[in-house]
Amino acid sequence: MAVYVGMLRLGRLCAGSSGVLGARAALSRSWQEARLQGVRFLSSREVDRMVSTPIGGLSYVQGCTKKHLNSKTVGQCLETTAQRVPEREALVVLHEDVRLTFAQLKEEVDKAASGLLSIGLCKGDRLGMWGPNSYAWVLMQLATAQAGIILVSVNPAYQAMELEYVLKKVGCKALVFPKQFKTQQYYNVLKQICPEVENAQPGALKSQRLPDLTTVISVDAPLPGTLLLDEVVAAGSTRQHLDQLQYNQQFLSCHDPINIQFTSGTTGSPKGATLSHYNIVNNSNILGERLKLHEKTPEQLRMILPNPLYHCLGSVAGTMMCLMYGATLILASPIFNGKKALEAISRERGTFLYGTPTMFVDILNQPDFSSYDISTMCGGVIAGSPAPPELIRAIINKINMKDLVVAYGTTENSPVTFAHFPEDTVEQKAESVGRIMPHTEARIMNMEAGTLAKLNTPGELCIRGYCVMLGYWGEPQKTEEAVDQDKWYWTGDVATMNEQGFCKIVGRSKDMIIRGGENIYPAELEDFFHTHPKVQEVQVVGVKDDRMGEEICACIRLKDGEETTVEEIKAFCKGKISHFKIPKYIVFVTNYPLTISGKIQKFKLREQMERHLNL
């Protein structure tokens, strides 16, 4: 047997749906294309081991395909784990004083799933979960999957117009939320676009602006026109409804859509990336394998998750990965709080910690950081946006996370496609986002020539494999723009790949600055500015300029207590970077515009700077 790199394809049948771009079977690239691209044949022996390094000097790599992918649904995975480790702690929600074993969680999920069906929801209906991290969020994530209902992850910070947009976009039939969190009055926000809810019969809502929405469920307070979540769960507790749920399981497929994750909106209007059981189960399972969770003892499987569950990293690498490996998921607070994360590590003997770079910066900067017992920590995941090398080193050394893994992915890819191995060196973790994940292909394309880029040459990163979404819900044209005929997803990220297969994200193709014909990648300059001893964080954007087209603007956040000047920063650049890369504008800031998941919205930052500079 002989196959070539690029021909190992994973065919998958995706359930047809009115919102998804038809059936998605992964297609093989022709052997002629492979030869034209300089890709050589592999022996069967090579196929059996990990194929994680580029061949022929070109930026293409394929992950290991030795182990089979998992064809179970989320519900089947929960059942397997509950049978294997029934008495192990599954979920701890510190701010709600919730503790459940896997057996208890399975029982509650079954009742909630049965309850959702009992109130008239059906397989394929969309249910929006709108709120901060909570027990109810985890319950709805798993119960919808068990019932065949598609969970719509709604940003908890959304206001009326944003909420209306996403509910209409996917045709939500049900919406679940708490009454209030901090200043966010969820019920009152809904009333702005759905005033009919106040006088509606619970479960029989008829709304002019939201014609698909019939059922509103309140998590924690009786509200006019709504059902209480406890009532829904109680309704599903009868033997009749539980038997019906069991009967319905035979009609669920791992290729059914399970979750609509709206992209973060860092570049414009959010799009509803639609993911299947197959996407989510396998991505979480493969990431756990990369983290070597199968080698850990129960005491070493205690995951602190400060990331929002509405985001793909939280729901897949958090909830689902813990479910797959029998790990304990610990929610420290409703939204990220650095102090609460440290308290959770200390109190719950946490071993793994997730976070974005911004979250880790805040954790490290806690005034009483040294007072917490973090001796049980051993690893974790940092993802969401590029992390400077100095931050990686600080996390490993100060938080005791020697097995830290830098992960890269996109919502459209379920999400993780690149990650380090725990044993990779600090330098490798500081300078790249790791190596390709199993059952995943990556290539970097020369954006001008449309061919495979040579190694160590920037180009647009493309991904193919089981992990690619079913499509953007209700937007076939945007799906076609993102996923080409050969099933490659074009990420929009500019990246390089070295001889060992390590990938480095250079920036967004839309973020690339073109100054007088010179291509400038913000990530390169951001890495450089992080070497300045007074700089805490920096973001580089392009701002409009009549003469040069664009000029460089560095938005710098200084370390606490530090002071410097524009002149000193520019002097620091001279002789170290090319003259055309020295920013024309240096602006000192105290914060950046962020999505709720902690990603920096560069398009908003660019707009702010252009206003600030009167451009």
Swiss-Prot record:
Belongs to the ATP-dependent AMP-binding enzyme family. The keyword Nucleotide-binding applies. SUPFAM superfamilies: Acetyl-CoA synthetase-like. It comes from Homo sapiens (Human). This is Medium-chain acyl-CoA ligase ACSF2, mitochondrial. InterPro entries: AMP-bd_C (IPR025110), AMP-bd_C_sf (IPR045851), AMP-binding_CS (IPR020845), AMP-dep_synth/lig_dom (IPR000873). ATP binds at residues 263-271, 493, 508, 599. GO terms for cellular component: mitochondrial matrix; mitochondrion.
